[in-house]
């Protein structure tokens, strides 16, 4: 029993020493981690750094009220309200800042006026009852305004205003009990608040402004284009892999799909709310149809949702007849192209006319696949059973893509997108690709040619793609 | 030309009169609409009304500082900070209120201490440079803290604290330039803030407290149970309709599915963040595994997402072989039962052991369906093609339900759910129903009995359900 004890002691000592030695390095490692995260945040969106500098600048500017004797003599201790306003009101986007300024300004004015009225009423009611009457007023308005904050519309846009209303009403009405010069004080405060708010607005709008509307516009476009990329590249890889070699599938695009599904809803709604406060800027008018972006966003999410089950099938080695694979691949790649055209139309604010032929192709491809499956079902059954889930996802997706197309068309009418000058180069190479694909299919299975014969009523433009 | 003009004039007059007459009724109608909405909000969750009354009570209580002479003499104009604290800090849930109180309190203390230190440094640097040094400090801290607010973790839990830090640091350090009794002033403010915050906390916790953790717990359970109901009832209706008469499908459950998909994510994350601030209460310990609820919520959303395409098939009249319909119906109803058992386990905080047999049944049903489809595919092809999309959705869903089961099991281990005292009555009637269903199938198609023979290795419990 002596041996183990002896050898244990030094181990404990060594462990203790190691633990002790690591103490300074642990917080250092953490600090390094934080620094790395900070650099990533700044690289990811440099506007964050600019925003921080803008806040610093504005706070320092407003502090001048304290440093400069003549200004301070006029405003006194109320000057602190200017600093307060800046810190509380300065938001990342112009819309956020304007919204908070308006909320704060209007709520302060309205609440102060009402509170002075309430004070007057209380004085009229007689000296003794004054505190009770004012207490009653304060109670009633606090209850009412707290309840109004639960209204969904108020919560989305005027929550801050309601808070300031309760605050100002309470402060002004109870101050009236003690300070007789309440109006003079309120004046000084109001002036400082206006100074703070206007400095804020000036810095926010004039120096590298961040427009929530522009962010929303880009974000919705980016999501559609990500979905399009996913469809084009990812599905391509998926089919290549089953026919060619085992190519490593790039996982990032799947996680992109997930981020569209999960995070976009809240972000889009916030941005649309903020964008509503913004004046016209750049290509956007004052009443740009921001709500329509939410509709497009919802449809994009729906489409991503319908694509989600596809992940499960990607890992299985698909062994379906070549011509069915071809049709499915065609539909996916057409969807991808449609979505990318739509995203491009949103981005450049041009009419999405170039997406229309893709949508037509898509409908044709989807119909063709259905016909093919019905006629081809006499083939190897287990293979067809394997491919059917993907075909189902595809059919769902096609209707989703069509809906997105309609919604973008509506947007282009509402926001008066400009017409595009034609470019037809991109399309040609794709047609060649699809034709190849069909020729392989035609050679292999006769039922396909029957399916094609059934569709002779289609226009020449569509027939190329059948 | 005289005739129409004559008849037009009175029309304009009448229209004008009608428009004029409607003026008072329009705002009245709007007011009535708002009142109706308010009543609905209060009925929907009476805690909203109680919260509003609590806010009113607390604001009025704190206003007493102004009414009572001895209190006012001690605190002076700083008493307004108490009102301010109450209005800004009082949140709907206990977690929100505690979080804001801690954020406000700690940030104020830290910022005030640092600002006093900065002031001291500035004084040491010599009288002339003082404003510049302080201006530099204010600038640096405002930039740094504004940037720190972009860190996702900080944004989720400490955003308000960061705001208060910037505010307090700026106010205290620039006040130091003017007011020599800055420490005395800070003391009075701190006391009033503590008074405001403690009144807030007392009212919030002692009178009808709203626990964010409890809300999260119930909400996650409710979503799972809604999904279970949707599966059981809705799918039942769907198949009844195709075989029996055209029964009206109740749409509300589809919209429930949508609300799970769209709104739950943000709400769950907010509640989990708030729940993190709450002390132990009722059945929940201080460190209840709130994060696990987020995981369960994510899986529930995934399951709802996979079910979403089913809506498109509900409107088509399904005409598949009876025994396949039976299998699918069985799988959906088993999933429904599993989910409802899991929801019940969460709700009552008991171990979800009663869900396990359902999960086993579910796996069996899913396997059986696959076998059946493979063997039964020689039947009427167009019918099978019609049923396959639903079968695909079902397979996806089964794996989702299994994952939810695993996650709930994990939760029950982490949160030490109590074991359940057995109840076996519910299950029996279901077995009878399923048996019926199988007997119909058995009579019609021989391939099913082969499928069943293949599975003789299952336990007796499972065989009843095959």
Stretch-by-stretch model annotation:
Chain A
Residues 1-189, 205-215, 449-466:
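Alpha-helical transmembrane segments and their membrane-interface boundaries
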Residues 1-36, 42, 180-191, 202-387:
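Intracellular, membrane-proximal regulatory regions of polytopic membrane proteins
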Residues 56, 298, 302, 389-392, ...:
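Aromatic- and histidine-enriched alpha-helix N-cap/loop-to-helix transition segments
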Residues 91-92, 306-308, 400-402:
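Extracellular/lumenal glycan-associated surfaces
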């Amino acid at each position: 029993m002596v041996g183990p004890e002896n050898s244990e002691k030094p181990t404990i000592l060594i462990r203790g020493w190691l633990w002790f030695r690591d103490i300074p390095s642990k917080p250092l490692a953490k600090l390094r981690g934080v620094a790395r995260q900070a650099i990533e945040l700044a690289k990811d969106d440099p506007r964050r750094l600019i925003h921080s500098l803008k806040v610093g600048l504005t706070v320092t500017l407003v502090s001048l009220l304290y440093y400069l004797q003549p200004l301070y003599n006029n405003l006194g201790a109320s000057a602190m309200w200017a600093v307060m306003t800046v810190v509380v009101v300065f938001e990342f986007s112009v819309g956020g800042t304007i919204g908070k300024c308006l909320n704060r300004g209007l709520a302060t004015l309205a609440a102060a006026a009402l509170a002075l009225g309430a004070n007057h009423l209380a004085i009229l009611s007689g000296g003794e009852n004054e505190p009770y009457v004012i207490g009653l007023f304060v109670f009633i308005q606090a209850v009412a305004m707290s309840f109004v904050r639960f209204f969904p519309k108020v919560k989305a846009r005027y929550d801050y205003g309601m808070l300031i209303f309760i605050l100002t009403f309470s402060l002004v009405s109870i101050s009236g009990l003690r300070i007789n010069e309440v109006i003079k004080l309120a004046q000084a405060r109001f002036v400082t608040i206006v100074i703070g708010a206007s400095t804020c607005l000036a810095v926010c709008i004039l120096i590298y402004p961040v427009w929530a509307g522009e962010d929303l516009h880009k974000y919705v476009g980016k999501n559609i284009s990500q979905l399009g990329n996913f469809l084009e590249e990812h599905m391509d890889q998926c089919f290549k892999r089953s026919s060619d070699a085992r190519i490593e599938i790039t996982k990032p695009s799947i996680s992109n799909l997930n981020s569209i599904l999960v995070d976009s809803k809240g972000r889009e709604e916030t941005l649309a709310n903020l964008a509503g406060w913004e004046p016209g800027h750049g290509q956007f008018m004052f009443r740009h149809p921001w709500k329509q972006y939410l509709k497009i966003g919802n449809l994009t999410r729906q489409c991503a949702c319908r694509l989600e089950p596809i992940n499960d099938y990607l890992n299985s080695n698909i062994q379906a007849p070549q011509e069915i694979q071809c049709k499915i691949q065609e539909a996916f790649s057409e969807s991808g192209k449609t979505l990318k055209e739509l995203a491009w139309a949103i981005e450049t604010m041009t009419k999405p006319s170039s997406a229309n032929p893709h949508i037509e192709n898509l409908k044709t491809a989807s119909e063709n696949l259905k016909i093919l499956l019905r006629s081809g079902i006499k083939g190897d059954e287990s293979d067809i059973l394997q491919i059917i889930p993907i075909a189902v996802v595809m059919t769902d997706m096609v209707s989703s893509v069509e809906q997105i197309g309609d919604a973008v068309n509506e947007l282009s009418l509402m926001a008066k997108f400009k017409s595009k000058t034609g470019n037809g180069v991109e399309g040609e190479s794709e047609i060649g690709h699809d034709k190849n694909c069909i020729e392989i299919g035609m050679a292999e299975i006769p039922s396909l040619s029957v399916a094609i014969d059934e569709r002779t009523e289609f226009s020449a433009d569509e027939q190329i793609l059948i």
